[in-house]
Each structure stands twice: as structure tokens, then as C-alpha cells.
Amino acid sequence: MNSKLSLSTKLSSSGKTQLAEYFATPPFKVITLPSYDDAWANGLNAMQMSSSPGVLAGDLLEIDISLAKLTALSLNTQAFTRVQAMNEGDSAMQTTHILLAENSRLFYLPHPLVLHKDSVFKQQTQIEMGEQSELIYGEIVAIGRVLNDERFAFRQFSSHLKIYTLKDDGKKRPLVSDCIQWLPSKMNLTALSQMENYSHQGSLTYLNLAKNNAEIKQQVQALQQQSTEEKDLLIGISQLNEYGLMVRVLGCRAEQIQKLFEKIGRLLKSV
């Protein structure tokens, strides 16, 4: 099935963020949620939903998100995404393109991705950021249905994340390039420095084009201090070359990583 979700934001006359354009084909759907107490004043809170039991062989999923100048969007998802079993040679793919205009802000944290036995899933995410825009973007993936004794029973998983800053002349300059490539039949994914005995991996990328390296360093140090309070998680927090930081987490429970990223998101929004 070919499915598409496309949404954009606009600023209302009262200065609040609203949906400008919205288009979705099954199984995608987006609903806006009531306003809430959030550090991003006048932002929009929305939920991405799906009526499908999971991602099936041959699925091509396309997501396009565009934020207008001065708007802020917090986008979450309804439930886990399950990549179902597939016949040999079959696969599914998702492409995500996000465009942040000048001074816009996006928090996007999908629920964890669960890779079922014999599944093949490839995802590509490209994000383009305008001047002084802000991004908090997370990904969480589970190596299988661990309670069903499925550990690395999928065939392949790949995730490519590329983030660029948009210059005045229209050219793009790369800020982040991150790649995960798992082939259980060819890789020892339980080795040291890989997944070891953990079953879930999370990545949270934060970029704020209005902050300098000294300000980002302070945020890294604050997060590193707070991470010592977390139990049963292996957490690494690194400062990027410029404008941001990345958090990597290994754990054994998806919900624990999800809550940690939500907590970090609230902290980053407030500084």
C-alpha cells in the first residue's frame, strides 16, 4: 500500500499555531489536541494516528511536514509501529521530509518501532532547517518481540537521518548524518559496542540554530548530570559539531526510553 501524510502549519491572527494544510491517505490520520501547559507558548499539539495493524510487505509510507515561520508543533504518535513478517525478497519503506522555516520549532517523537520476525524495513529521514529554527527529533526501535523470544529475528533494518541548514542563497549545508544498518544474518549485533544484551535502542537529536557551542555545552552537561539518575539504561550524550547534541540510549523497555525522551524534550523546550 502507498500511504501519504502531509501537513503544514500557519500562524493565526492571534499568534497561535494552526494546521494550514493537511492531507492523509489510509491508514494515516492526524488529530489536534487541546492546548496544554508547554514552554513553547502558542504552539500546536497534535497526534499522528494509524488504523493499520502494522507495516506490511510492499508498503511505501511517505510523510511530509512543513512548519511556517514562527510556528511551533509538538507531534506524537498513537501507538507502536509494528513491522510485520514478510516473505523473502519483500520489504517496506518509509520516507520522511521535514522543512522548518525561520524561527519555527518542532518536537517529533514517534512511538517505538517493533521489528517482527522475517521483516525488512528501510527508512530515510531528511530535515531542512531555516535560520534560528529548533528541532527535537527522536527514534526508538525494538529488536523484536522479546517476550515471544524474538531477538534479531528480522532480516534487515536501516535508518538514514540527514539534517541540513538552509542558507540565504538557497543552498543546503549538512549538520547531521546518522545511519543505522542492521543485518542480523551477517552481523554480530550482540557484540560489545553493539546492542549487547539490550533489546531497545533510542536516538534523540536536538538542534537549535539560535544557540552557540557554549550554550549547547551547558545543556549537554546538565543532561549528563540528570542521566545518572536513570536506572537500567545505558545513556550517552554527545555534543555535535555545531548547534546541537545527540542522545543515544540502550535499554530493555520501550516505555522507559519513551518517557526519558519526553522528559528530555520538556527540559530542552524550556531552555
UniProtKB/Swiss-Prot annotation:
GO CC, alphabetical = cytoplasm
Q: Which UniProt keywords apply?
A: Chaperone, Cytoplasm, Nickel insertion
Cellular localisation: Cytoplasm
**Mainly resides where?**
cytoplasm
Listed GO molecular functions?
A: nickel cation binding
Q: Fetch the InterPro entries from UniProt.
A: UreD
Pfam name, any one: UreD
Q: What's this protein's function? A: Required for maturation of urease via the functional incorporation of the urease nickel metallocenter.
Outline the subunit composition. Answer: UreD, UreF and UreG form a complex that acts as a GTP-hydrolysis-dependent molecular chaperone, activating the urease apoprotein by helping to assemble the nickel containing metallocenter of UreC. The UreE protein probably delivers the nickel.
Family, similarity comment: Belongs to the UreD family.
Under PANTHER family, the record lists: UREASE ACCESSORY PROTEIN D
Identification of the protein by name: Urease accessory protein UreD
Q: What species is given as this protein's source? A: Haemophilus influenzae (strain 86-028NP)
Give the encoding gene's name: ureD
